[in-house]
Amino acid sequence: EIIIYRRRFTRWGVDGTLVIKGTKVCNTIEHPERYLPAGDYEIAFVSIANKSRKMPVILRKGQAVWEVGINSPCLKPGNGPMTLKYGCIILGKAVASGLVIHSQEYFDRLCERLRKASKKMECIKLRIIDWGSDDISIAF
């Protein structure tokens, strides 16, 4: 299970921490207004028409893989959240509110882990939790 702890909501973005099996993997940023509601989701690798490769798409509750389109939320590389649409989440190393670096590197690493799980036919769960910076463990 992947958990994203949202720590800070600012006008520059929603800053979070992505954790797998209790270990911090990377930071996340989302658009300050167009982000997914906190809750449980699944992740599936899907070919999207406007992308050159399969992307880790975030499936909403009850959504089937064949219902995914170009406007589906996904995990992706990037630098800042202002161009994000549809609830997409950028991965990377946080340097300021709404800004990450080394995004492609963190994205590729996470995708490799997710692909291995997918090949084993494991269901990839995503839980998004809204926590303030005072609530999240110092370890993250």
What positions do the PLM features span?
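Cell wall/extracellular polymer interaction/catalysis modules
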Residues: E1-K125, I129-I136, F140
